[in-house]
Amino acid sequence: MEHRVPHKMPHTMLLHGLGQSSDSWKQVIDCLPTEQKEELHTPDLFALSEEISYEGLYRGWEQSCQKLPGRLHLCGLSLGAVLALDYTIRHPQRVESLVLIAGQYRSPKFLLSVQSLLFSLMPASNFAQLGISKEQMLRLNRSMIPLDLSRQLSTVRCPVLLLCGEQDKVNRKASEQMLHLLPNARKREVAGAAHEVNLQAPQQLAKELSAFWESLPKSSDL
């Protein structure tokens, strides 16, 4: 008699945004089916690197990915989406699927400049809960200004889900552009959410993630 082995999800990474922490995914995870939680990782990006810059965060997180076997499902919001896209470009053989929430592929320089100004006016205590200083946050923001992944988008061959809150006017344009620039992308809007979809619509986000992962072809780990 043949015994079927249940399909095992690849390791899945949920990457938080700027101003968030790994706890920002808790409500989303609570709404996911049990089988999709088995190999789930929510790294605290700021704890993975001693150098708080874009490249420092990327390298610290990249090293944690290299410790995991097989292929990966990557899902990131905002800063996390940029990191996930960058990793997929640099390591296409490692990525099974990609979810980009409120993502950008080219830094919006004006918005980053405004954000830096706002950060500079905030008290240092506002950054303590993230485990970084005010100066480190400003340095991180400045380090992202030159970022531009536009030339590499056509090399991303894995299935991609682009998610954007229906009220997130800032990132909607980038999502529309990526829909046409990424070869295997689909796009959905999350009702009732703006930028921080994982905090503003966790149940709806969990449904979108679960449906996307369920729709993927089942493949064995590398």
Question: What residue ranges belong to the model's regions?
Answer:
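Gly/Ala-rich beta-loop-alpha elbow adjacent to hydrolase catalytic centers
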Residues: 76-80, 84
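Short beta-strand/loop motif that positions the catalytic acidic residue
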Residues: 155-156, 162-164
